[in-house]
Amino acid sequence: MEIQILNWLQSLHTPILDKIMQLITHLGDAGIIWIILTIVMILIPKTRKSGVIMAAALIVDVILCNVILKNLIARVRPYDVNTAVQVLVAKPKDFSFPSGHTAASFASVTALYLAGEKKLWKPALALAILIAFSRMYLYVHY
């Protein structure tokens, strides 16, 4: 069923949407957008505590998702199942589940919410949803 959903998403592709999704997915590469936000928040005294909470969430996320779960579950990527689909980004070499981009995004959003960052967590949630969607749109995750 999952592969059928991803295959259906392929019908949504347009040159403009392809570029937008590539840009959005690259914001999540190595959690870069969340790491930058964390550093900025740590540097600002008013948001330092929230930045530390975010840093802790990202560290736990990397250990739990990228080091433990990915290797334990060892799920192949969709482009390895359906080799006919043209992948528009560099093919990741690690396993598919869980998505590091998505996990880092939602770990950050959760940290912002729990830290009481009312002005930040909602836009961060919107970005996290877009990053998660981009990973499926680009055929690198289920």
List where the protein language model places each region.
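N-terminal transmembrane-helix/juxtamembrane module of multi-pass inner/ER membrane proteins
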Residues: 1-32, 66-93
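Membrane-helix interface segments
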Residues: 16-17, 46-51, 116-123
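Short helix-capping/hinge motifs at transmembrane helix termini and TM-loop junctions
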Residues: 29, 44-46, 73-74, 135-142
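Hydrophobic, aromatic-rich transmembrane alpha-helices
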Residues: 34-44, 107-113
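Small-polar-interrupted transmembrane alpha-helices in polytopic inner-membrane proteins
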Residues: 56-72, 120-134
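Membrane-embedded catalytic cores of phosphoryl/pyrophosphoryl-handling enzymes
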Residues: 86-142
